[in-house]
Swiss-Prot record:
Protein name as catalogued: Glutamate 5-kinase 1
SMART domains given in the database record: PUA
Domain of life of the native organism: Bacteria
Zinc found in the keyword field: no
Gene designation: proB1
Domain called PUA: residue spans: 278-355
Entry keyword set: Amino-acid biosynthesis, ATP-binding, Cytoplasm, Kinase, Nucleotide-binding, Proline biosynthesis, Transferase
GO BP, sorted A to Z: L-proline biosynthetic process
Family: Belongs to the glutamate 5-kinase family.
Organism expressing this protein natively: Mesorhizobium japonicum (strain LMG 29417 / CECT 9101 / MAFF 303099)
Sites where the protein binds substrate: 53, 140, 152
Pfam families listed in its UniProt record: AA_kinase (PF00696), PUA (PF01472)
Length: 378
């Protein structure tokens, strides 16, 4: 396993079940041990960002809401109570190692809308320059099912790539990736290293999540695809033991995901990491080949348009068999895209009634994903 001390900027994600016990509340001893690990890495020159789940779980414990399913407004109220307690706990724990901390609450638009993405990145960068540890969570007090990340694994990957982290560590209640969910298959084999997240690797993930958290192995692999495509390595390991980061240093079990050899950079990192494409364009075999060779997507190659998107939105591009092969910023809104799908460039102006762009998605706004999980700028 790779030593954490070789990395200069590390994003660490903590699952709810690690931080919160339903009976006793916050696991302070565990949190203190993790904060001590962070202090060791910081003293070695690393910059650490924390993505911390647990606000709703902690809030429902404080409020005595029990195990029943919560209504949306109850979850948001629990998050409000839990978040203030969680922020204080992080401040106290990190302060033991003379580390300052700052709370960042994000909603989906803060990473998916370009201007807000740049603003969030600037704020977090300033915290790091000031030697403060950013403690980041989704703003569950205002997020709804339609406008939320849904899990902090993908949020952590989005933060890691936004901030140019060279390592993402997902601490969970499972110690890595297996050939099948170990709870279902006692013969499942542990996988120490993943070179690329292929469809075969994705098939190994079960959909089940912990009782207190929303994520499962599938969301962790989704996070891995986002992170590794941008050149960020990833580790999945158990956080149930004390001092979980130093446990990695000691060689405890963990799965290491290698970063892409051809990572997406800069502007295209934002496009590639979009979590919720506004629509989908299904293309023909000829367009698949053109995209793979670095060309723009022309209307002639588009066979099906789905979704209600506007010009400039991110859309997913699907192959004839339904696999996602690229993402890009579309040059037309959905209504016009439907009208010109399948048309040659010379026919577009006649149909739309105005001089329009020749490409549905220009190559400069396009990120092509290749088999095996690598992504290139096209």
């Amino acid at each position: 396993m790779q030593s954490l001390k070789k990395y200069r900027r590390i994003t660490v994600k903590i699952g709810s079940a690690l931080l919160v016990d339903r009976a006793s509340g916050l696991k302070r001893d565990w949190l203190d041990s993790l904060a001590d690990d962070i202090a060791v890495l910081a003293q070695g020159g690393a910059e650490i960002l924390v993505v911390s789940s647990g606000a709703i779980a902690l809030g429902r414990t404080i409020l005595g809401l029990g195990k029943r399913a919560l209504k949306l407004e109850e979850s948001q109220a629990a998050a409000a109570v839990g978040q203030i307690a969680l922020a204080g706990a992080w401040s106290d724990a990190l302060g033991r190692g003379a580390l300052k901390s700052g709370q960042i609450l994000l909603t989906l638009g803060d990473t998916e809308e370009r201007r807000r993405y740049l603003n969030a990145r600037a704020t977090i960068s300033t915290l790091l320059k000031m030697k403060a540890v950013p403690v980041i969570n989704e703003n569950d007090t205002v997020a709804t099912s339609e406008i939320r990340y849904g899990d902090n694994d993908r949020l952590a990957a989005r933060v890691a790539t936004m901030m140019g982290a060279d390592l993402l560590v997902l601490l969970s209640d499972i110690d890595g990736l297996y050939t099948a969910p170990p709870a279902r298959d006692p013969k499942a084999k542990f996988i120490p290293v993943v070179d690329r997240i292929t469809p075969d690797i994705e098939a190994m993930a079960g959909a089940a999540a912990s009782e207190l958290s929303r994520g499962g192995m599938r969301t962790k692999l989704d996070a891995g695809k986002i992170a590794t495509a941008a050149g960020t390595a990833m580790i999945i390991t158990s956080g149930t033991r004390l001092s979980p980061l130093m446990a990695i240093e000691r060689g405890e079990r963990a799965t290491f995901f290698r970063p892409s050899a051809n990572p997406v950079k800069g502007y295209k990192t934002w496009i590639a990491g979009q979590l919720e494409p506004a629509g989908r364009l299904t293309v023909d075999a000829g367009a698949v080949g053109a995209l793979a060779s670095g060309k723009s997507l022309l209307p002639a190659g588009v066979k099906l348009v789905s979704g209600n998107f506007s010009r400039g939105d991110t859309v997913a591009i699907l192959s004839p068999d339904g696999r996602e092969i690229a993402r890009g910023l579309v040059a037309y809104d959905a209504a016009d895209a439907v009208r010109i799908a399948g048309l040659k460039t010379a026919e577009i102006e006649t149909v739309l009634g105005y001089e329009a762009r020749s490409a549905m998605i220009h190559r400069d706004d396009l990120v092509v994903s290749h088999a095996g999980g690598d992504i290139s700028g096209g």
